[in-house]
Amino acid sequence: MKNYIFFLLLSIITLNSFAQEFQGKAFYISKTKMDPNFGKNMPPERKQRIMERLKSNLEKNYELDFNSTSSLFYEEERLSVSGGDGRFNFMSFMSPFQGILHKEFGTKTFTNRIEFFGKFFLIKDSLPNSKWMLSGESKQIGIYMAYKATTSREVPEQVFQFGRQSENEENKKSKMKTVNIIAWFTPQIPVSTGPHKHGGLPGLILEVSADNTTVLCTKVVMNPNDRIKIKEPNKGTKVTQREYEQIRKDKIAEMREMYGRNRRRGGGSGNRSR
């Protein structure tokens, strides 16, 4: 135990003293399991069609550019599975992360640029103040020795469902739920960041599991020949995280109402409405 405490202290010292002149790029793969309650009010045939459309969105590849003061997290470019014309997109609601995320370590703030129904938003807010518990467990991830840390976080429950909801279900959607988070970090890369908004540990997070999603680092490139430029996104409507969640919730309610109207008319095409 004494050796473990000494190791952690050494890691923090390393983070402060050697993290001055370096940069790197980490590559991650994200896998999400479908929520078993998804589409519980939906006809089986329709649910199956949507599940097929969602498959490609449950596994994604991301990149994380980082230096000693900031990082930039984003999805690797690929052919779009849906148009960017502002049409309703089921897949966007199943992704645990959207857009481009810039983190500033010194101020512990983030800027997340997201496109939502054809409009760009700049979510600017404070990073979660995660209270990590270090277990002392370790494992090898690639060439790096990683150490286990756990925490929990309150997040909004998934607010989008198909079909008719009861009053109780409507009220439930505004509640929060507790998500347990397991992270594996390596002090060999002394930067306090990781995928999504995760960070605050004395080393790069190589693997993290939260809710139904696991993100695993597949490769790290330190100090590449081509210098990495980390720029904070600056185009879009500025909102806080809370304000964006309300905008998103209102839009989902609007789409649900539109979907219900189309069903009552017998069109069954709510998902194609603009």
What are these regions (language model features)?
Residues M1-A26:
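Bacterial Sec-dependent N-terminal signal peptides
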Residues E21-R274:
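Extended soluble regions of mature proteins
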